[in-house]
């Protein structure tokens, strides 16, 4: 009958030597070479300490019903028309003030409690001699993130579009995107930018100047921008028809970069260290077995009797 190897187990051997012997020195050296180089390899291969990480979240966005509109007119009626939801701004406009009809609606498409888009429509009544060649529009939003970092801010969508031909309607369909110059910190409340984009209480014209508003906004490290590469300018307005701005602004899911917390960094570093360490442990185990079996360093070999056998002898 042919015999097969059905089971095997290693026999344990120990090697004895003094604590100050060459063998002890060799073991110390081997331990150092096993545990320290993986650390250096992990460290030198970059990304040992996780500095930035990212996650996805749909922000909670709310239109704040603040609007600032400047409509640039054709040369025959020189200048512009303006209107905003800020009484102080409107007072400054004199006879350039023209009150439009505004209707807005926020929609939650997937019924998850977060609004997904804003439908904004503005109809600016015009006299038959007035022609709109360009539009500057600011809408403000309250913008919140919850999942990793709690961010609360007031942000804006700035829309500017102009065309050489007088328009009847401007159609915009774009995303309100988050722009980060800096990763968010993990945990805690970030209300640094929970300040209004336009200071509506100020009586000074300077505070409503578009260059000033945009410049102050761009100083921020976290902003939102309206991203619509192709606003559509429709022409052919009837003499008594208003100029219409039709905007659909979507609130998409964002990839948010943040600074990981301490334990996340430690976990990431540990995983890298251990996966390299395993290779070193395996290699040095072979080296140690070779060195002791072949008596490269002098020791006294002892074969340890397996424990089970000892027990058995004791019992019988
Ligand atoms: C953010 O600002 C709004 C309006 O000023 C205020 O009602 C709200 O409490 C603020 N939120 C935080 C977290 O500071
Ligand atoms: C808004 O303007 C008023 C008047 O100039 C000023 O007192 C107030 O501090 C301003 N608020 C902010 C938030 O800048
Ligand atoms: C904005 O980011 C820069 C660079 O990361 C940083 O030095 C600065 O302190 C940040 N400003 C604020 C107000 O957090």
UniProtKB/Swiss-Prot annotation:
Keywords: Cell membrane, Cell projection, Ciliopathy, Cilium, Cilium biogenesis/degradation, Disease variant, Glycoprotein, Joubert syndrome, Meckel syndrome, Membrane, Transmembrane, Transmembrane helix. One of its GO terms (cellular component) is MKS complex. It holds the Pfam family TM231. Glycans are attached at residues 194, 199, 221. InterPro entries: TMEM231 (IPR019306). Transmembrane component of the tectonic-like complex, a complex localized at the transition zone of primary cilia and acting as a barrier that prevents diffusion of transmembrane proteins between the cilia and plasma membranes. Required for ciliogenesis and sonic hedgehog/SHH signaling. Belongs to the TMEM231 family. This is Transmembrane protein 231. It comes from Homo sapiens (Human). The gene is TMEM231.
